[in-house]
Amino acid sequence: MDNGDRSGAGAGAVGSAGSLGLRVGQAVFSSASLLFMSVGVEFFSYTAFCFLVTIMGLVIPWSCTLAMIDVYSVFVGCPLRVPGVMVIVVVGDCALSIVSFAAACSSAAVIDLLLQLHGSHSSPTFCGRYQLSAMMAFLSWLLMAASATFNLWFVASRW
């Protein structure tokens, strides 16, 4: 499976340039989601928003750590191929993908409810920020799901 990647790994598997791009995107979108949600001090009033902040706070260090591993693997040319470590990465990616999707969906549902109430419980400025936060969370989830899929595919193809 040679796709022009120096590491010889799959297109988005840990240790490839594709994985580095996915991880950087995850960190950027998660940080943006956290920033947009944290700008409004009213988010503590809603459990779904607190859940989103917590999950995005977990995704950022996970993605940054794996991005550093990818940088090392891409530039040094020493890919991460230890099966036990790859299984941990796959399990972590899958778990964070599921909970980030749940957080994004629950936040979007609460935002929709707040907008249907015509802003009587929240100002339109905060609702706009919350919408941006949920959108960034969905984009982060999309990249996280892609990483989980690529890494699962890589692990399954090695055994």
From Swiss-Prot:
One of its GO terms (cellular component) is plasma membrane. Residues 1-6, 70-94, 156-159 are cytoplasmic. It is found in: Cell membrane. InterPro entries: CASP_dom (IPR006702), CASPL-5 (IPR045009). The chain crosses the membrane at residues 7-29, 49-69, 95-117, 135-155. Its main location: membrane. Residues 30-48, 118-134 are extracellular. It is a multi-pass membrane protein. Keywords: Cell membrane, Membrane, Transmembrane, Transmembrane helix. Belongs to the Casparian strip membrane proteins (CASP) family. Homodimer and heterodimers. This is CASP-like protein 5C1. It comes from Zea mays (Maize).
